[in-house]
Amino acid sequence: MAHNINRQQSESLFTPRNAVLHGDCIELMRGMERESVDFILTDPPYITRYRGRDGRTVANDDNSRWLRPAFNQMHRVLKDGGFCVSFYGWNKVDLFVDAWRAAGFRIVGHIVFRKRYASCAR
């Protein structure tokens, strides 16, 4: 069955509705409209001073200065009824919970993964 669509409908079919942004998350979100995001999935530094077996480290994993500003912006851009999923370091859960609550998030649950190799935390 064929459907007739006009030019405007045709163009809207190919207009991107999703985007991947690369940059400092706090700065990027400051430029976004309030309540413009449906879903956030974030895997931020865990504040554990991670060091892999090969000596690799993670930027900003040695301090929590970014934590509250980042989650404040996430809460600001997230639509009412939107959903945010955040990974976090289990031994720093108190810092993450404080930041989530201070931003206005309501915690509804935790998901625990069984990993064969978990990095050590100092």
Locate predicted features:
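Core catalytic lobe of class I
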Residues: A2-R122
